[in-house]
Amino acid sequence: VPPVSAHDGLAVSAVSLSVVICCYTTARRTQVLRAIQTTLDQIAARDEIIVVVDHNDDLLADLQSTLPEQIALIANRFERGLSGARNTGVARSRGEVVVFVDDDAVPASGALDHARAPFEDRSVVAIGGAVRADWASGSAPGWFPDEFGWVVGCDYRGLPACGEQIRNPIGAAMAVRRTALVEIEGFSTELGRVGDLLAGCEETLMGVQLHARFPGHRIIRHTGFQVDHHIPAERATLGYFTRRCYQEGRSKAVLARISGRQAALSSERSYTSRILPSGAWRARANPRRVLALVIGFGYTAAGYVTGMALSARSAKAAA
């Protein structure tokens, strides 16, 4: 990847964007620079790019000597982890809308214009983009179920169509009105990834809180805002699949404790009662994929039960 170059001749835009890219490891340096350059090529005059380094001094020093001055490069000033890094970016942002792009995701051509457009409608408080899996091997493993794209942070079968309302976006490509995000105090540090810990659900809680705080406003899926999300070979294994499912269940238990089961599991009820059974039927000619569906559901459920038990134990100890 060549050095990131400055971008000139920017057009004036209607809705200003603050694009936040959070990174934490030098192992993704090439991907981080590609994500930044692709974003830089798309910004308009009133937009800004904020790169947040999550408690990694070596990476911070490297990027300081690499990135052009027009990019705001800052260190996570909150608790270590993705939620703290995102909150650092939000605190620094000045745009009307904060766009979040993962450090291993590359926005498609025109993605930022597509991220901007829905916010001309004042009823839209947030959007989720399309997250296309870019498998290092060229394609998903034969056993991998389409219904479990969320395991690798990508789109999955069962998502609403473009323009329809969603509970929450996928974190690799999402955008939120800055004032609304500040109003709900950003992302909870009780949830979300810390380094390689496979936790999640911080975007789910954000969506739940936005719906509660801004009734009558909408979070919609807008597939024109598309990114290609890199999936390394080590995430194309059954071991990663089961660990991620289990940690998702644990995270859902924390979410249920914070927001209540009704809000925490509203989308999952339809997913488990309708999408997974139909997925098993679609995959009936591929026994390995059917087995992966069952295993994925089992590990997620086990994580949830474990998380609820730990929450109950903690509540009892605190009483």
Regions found by a protein language model. Give the residues of each.
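Conserved donor NDP-sugar-binding/catalytic core segment of glycosyltransferases
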Residues: 110-143
